[in-house]
From Swiss-Prot:
HAMAP family: GTPase_Obg. Residues 1-159 form the Obg domain. This is GTPase Obg. The gene is obg. Its EC number is 3.6.5.-.
Length: 432
């Protein structure tokens, strides 16, 4: 399957079903009480990490993913059915990001982990809920709430314990073949590896871990040069970084240490937290004549005196056992570093992402010629919840607007009798 690590699409939770307006009717009971049932809740959009998936190709082909709407209430106090949740399965290691703000909505970092990202709308109440001693036959009902809607980007960041980084042709793929069961393509040209390659390695102490051969980096990668951002993002989840150096002299006069500093700089520019990860220096291609002639081992040890250094040959598998043991030792204490801190609620065992609602003031707009427009989140919720299709709902709609303070605001702005006040799709005549 083609490796796709980003996909953009929209998600839409189901709307809640409308409450019903109905009355009990039976022989010899012409004026029975209200018995309109509630609407069902809309289905939610839930993301689930699936260890069997390795690409976002199927999501790349989608434009919108929608959960089912809740069903409307019915007569005889029958409640509408709940809309079915939509489960969206993604590879382990996928981030779900809100497009407009860049906010991370979910970090799918564990197999079977579920996160509710778009919550379904609550079902509206039927008229049976509004009966009281003053109004025994109400025609009041609520419309179902609108389900949440987001434009999102899914971004797969490979989940591995160890990441091999270095310049193109440093021998990372050959080294991965030497220490694992992975068979990445190997050739003598730059950017042989265009996608992360994973392998499972076992050290002599019996410990096992996942190693990622990450595509070669070049100067400017942190700014996106040479597909830098596509490569660097996969390093963020690795608990240990193995920096592979080419000791063969293939870079001519370029100094091995300067090459290291170049790549290290790109890592930190991309994400400063990468500077905190444990690092092992892997001096590779020690089997070559150039490596023997250059006699750089002492210089390398001196420069990296505060780091663990291993001299290996991926081609001949020389000293790879020592490398594996050093990696295993580092992993004993290397902690997983979360990419974000998510405040979450728990909803039926599923982690739920809660967007913080913006505090938006009510907006009064004077359109001129006796026309006004009212807007804002508070007003929209009233407009959406109470359709003015019955006399009782019209009275309740006006009462809710009054309590919101919008009437006082209109008076302060100079609204007069006979003026038209537009509340979204409704046009109301001011009667003061």
């Amino acid at each position: 399957m083609k490796f796709i690590d980003t996909a953009k699409f929209t998600i839409k939770a189901g709307n809640g079903g409308n409450g019903a307006v109905s009355f009990h009717t039976a022989l010899f009971v012409p004026n029975g009480g209200p018995n309109g049932g509630d609407g069902g809740n809309g289905g939610s959009v839930i993301f689930e990490a699936d260890g069997g998936k390795h690409s976002l190709l199927d999501l790349k082909l989608q434009k919108q993913l929608s959960a089912q709407d809740g069903f409307k209430g019915d007569i005889k106090n029958m409640h509408g059915a709940q809309g079915k949740d939509l489960i969206v399965r993604v590879p382990v290691g996928t981030l779900i990001i809100e497009n407009k703000t860049g906010t991370i909505l979910a970090d799918m970092d564990e197999d079977k982990k579920q996160v509710l990202v778009a919550k379904g709308g609550k079902g509206g109440k039927g008229n049976a809920r509004f009966a009281n001693s003053r109004n025994k036959a109400p025609t009041i009902f609520e419309a179902g709430e609108i389900g949440q809607f987001y434009e999102v980007k899914a971004e797969l960041k490979v989940l591995a314990d160890v990441g091999f980084v270095g310049l193109p042709n440093a021998g990372k793929s050959t080294l991965l073949r030497a220490i694992s069961n992975s068979k990445p393509e190997v050739a003598d040209y730059a950017f042989t590896t265009l996608n992360p390659q994973l392998g499972v390695s076992r050290a002599k102490d019996g410990s096992t871990f996942v190693v990622a051969d990450l595509p070669g980096l070049i100067e400017g990668a942190s700014l996106g040069k040479g597909l830098g951002h596509q490569f660097l993002k996969h390093i963020e989840r690795c608990r240990v970084i193995c920096h592979v150096l080419d000791m063969s002299g293939n870079y001519g006069q370029e100094d091995v240490i300067k090459n290291y500093e170049l790549i290290r700089s790109e890592l930190v520019k991309y994400n400063y937290k990468l500077d905190e990860r444990p690092e092992i220096i892997v001096a590779n291609k020690m089997d070559t004549d150039e490596a023997q002639l250059n006699m750089m081992e002492e210089d390398i040890k001196k420069y990296f005196k505060d780091k663990k250094v291993v001299f290996v040959s991926g081609l001949l598998k020389d000293n790879v056992d020592e490398l594996l043991l050093k990696i295993a030792k580092e992993l004993e204490t290397a902690k997983y570093v979360p990419l974000w801190e998510m405040e979450q609620d728990i909803y039926e065992g599923i982690k739920v992402y809660r967007l913080e609602e913006d505090e938006e003031d009510i907006q009064i707009i004077n359109k001129g010629n006796g026309r006004w427009e009212v807007a804002g989140d508070t007003i929209y919720k009233i407009y959406q919840k109470f359709p003015i299709t019955t006399d009782d709902n019209l009275l309740l709609f006006n009462e809710k607007l009054k309590k919101s303070g919008v009437y006082d605001m209109l008076r302060e702005r100079g609204v007069g009798a006979g003026d038209i006040v537009k509340v979204f799709e409704y046009e109301l005549e001011w009667m003061d």
